[in-house]
């Protein structure tokens, strides 16, 4: 009688949410997936899908979430725009937490998948450049800052020029440094 009762779907969702609150993510993921598969199309299934999305974003596994959603035939799923946002937000969260290696990897995935033309291309390029800078991977940082410096009117253009100039000067590439210093004057 339990699986067919009118409160079973709600209980399954609540159990998944409890696991999530306890940070038992593997149990939460398993429970949410069971809720989605058992009660497909229900409000609880959609809530479980939202909770899964949040777990995968928080744990920097958004590609795994996207792959999972592609296996679901009977539910309205993510569009390319929401994939764009999910990958960006996941990388941004890693950046804000100071996890620059993970942020750089996430933003690089975003840039390769959605740019040019993605909603967050300029911001993703900026955060990628700063992540590489924080990791002291200066050649990769210069590459990203250069991409920013070439986009007229973006809010990061001056900072990108300054970073390129400073890094080039430190590398004794004085002509490049002078060029970017002059662009700012």
What is each model feature region?
Residues 1-185:
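Acidic, polar-rich low-complexity tracts and alpha-helical solenoid repeat scaffolds
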């Amino acid at each position: 009688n339990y699986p067919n009762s009118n409160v079973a779907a709600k209980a399954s969702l609540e159990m998944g949410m409890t696991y999530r609150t306890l940070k038992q993510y593997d149990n939460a993921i398993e429970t949410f997936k069971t809720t989605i598969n058992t009660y497909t199309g229900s409000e609880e299934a959609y809530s479980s899908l939202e909770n899964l999305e949040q777990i995968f974003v928080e744990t920097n596994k958004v590609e795994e979430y996207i792959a999972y959603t592609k296996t679901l035939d009977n539910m309205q799923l993510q569009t390319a725009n929401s994939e764009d946002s999910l990958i960006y937000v996941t990388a941004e969260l890693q950046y804000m937490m100071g996890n620059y290696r993970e942020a750089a990897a996430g933003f690089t995935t975003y840039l390769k998948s959605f740019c040019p033309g993605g909603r967050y291309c300029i911001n993703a390029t900026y955060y990628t450049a700063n992540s590489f800078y924080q990791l002291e991977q200066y050649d990769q940082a210069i590459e990203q800052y250069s991409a920013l410096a070439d986009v007229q009117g973006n809010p990061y253009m001056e900072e990108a020029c300054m970073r390129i100039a400073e890094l080039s000067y430190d590398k004794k590439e004085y002509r490049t440094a002078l060029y970017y210093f002059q662009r700012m004057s």
